[in-house]
UniProtKB/Swiss-Prot annotation:
It comes from Campylobacter hominis (strain ATCC BAA-381 / DSM 21671 / CCUG 45161 / LMG 19568 / NCTC 13146 / CH001A). Keywords: Repressor, Ribonucleoprotein, Ribosomal protein, RNA-binding, rRNA-binding, Translation regulation, tRNA-binding. This is Large ribosomal subunit protein uL1. One of its GO terms (molecular function) is structural constituent of ribosome. One of its GO terms (cellular component) is cytosolic large ribosomal subunit. NCBIfam families: rplA_bact. Binds directly to 23S rRNA. The L1 stalk is quite mobile in the ribosome, and is involved in E site tRNA release. Belongs to the universal ribosomal protein uL1 family. GO terms for biological process: regulation of translation; translation.
Length: 233
């Protein structure tokens, strides 16, 4: 087993492993753990009481964080004619159709989010095996398959976070930067959790959020009060 670095061990001294933190305490504490030479991402990790191998227990969606993510997002749009013009006017970084699909097939993926109009999803399907594993395949559930291109581009640029439960029932997401104010991080966190709660499957029995933790890119994690998370509606 790899040993923790001296820096990480120093951070561990600031964290009480036996403590369950409320949101305010967790955000206050996690901001004291910044030690990297870059603006670390504040990360939320959740363990949900779902079994995603069943389609009716898949938790997937998107949410626009009020303070954004602190990350510059490059947006590509697959559209034609008037919708292509709409994408350009909305501020999309890359706009195209067949030629953009060809670039993706070559491995030239110079974007973070891909949006497509519904009528071109047959075209997008040609590169599904490339986009799927990278988590950037357009999907109606994340509002990336839409005719409302202007709003989709705006949301992607302003801090939309897509989430999807993995095979073990976990959801991990970046909800801002450690340089954000405490209030900004708290608002982003509560907005994210509220959206997760809205997506609770009707077939999920028992305690929906089994555990939660807050951390930075390079820090130990803090255990969150799951009851407080569940109460966010």
């Amino acid at each position: 087993m790899a040993k923790n670095s001296k820096r990480f061990n120093e951070l561990l001294k600031k964290v009480d492993d036996s403590k369950i933190y409320n949101i305010n305490e967790a955000v206050e504490t996690v901001k004291t753990l910044a030690s990297a030479k870059f603006d670390e991402t504040v990360e939320i990790s959740l363990k949900l009481n779902v079994d995603p191998k069943y389609a009716d227990q898949m938790v997937r969606g998107s949410v626009v964080l009020p303070a954004g993510t602190g990350k510059k997002v490059r947006v590509a749009v697959i559209a034609k004619d008037a919708k292509a013009d709409e994408a350009k006017n909305a501020g999309a970084d890359i706009v195209g159709s067949e030629e953009l699909i060809e670039e993706i097939q070559k491995g030239n993926i110079n974007f973070d989010v891909l949006i497509a109009t519904p009528n071109l999803m047959g075209l997008v399907g040609k590169v599904g095996r490339i986009l799927g594993p990278k988590g950037i395949m357009p999907n109606p559930k994340t509002d990336t398959v839409t005719m409302d291109i202007t709003n989709a581009v705006k949301n992607a640029k302003s801090g939309q976070v897509n989430f999807r439960v993995d095979k073990q029932g976990n959801i991990n997401a970046g909800i801002g930067k450690v340089s954000f104010s405490k209030e900004q991080i708290c608002n982003n966190l509560t907005t994210f959790i509220k959206e997760i709660n809205k997506h609770k499957p009707a077939t999920s029995k028992g305690r929906y959020i089994k555990s939660g933790a807050l951390s930075l890119t390079m820090s130990p994690s803090l255990s969150l009060d799951t009851q407080e998370l569940l109460d966010l509606k």
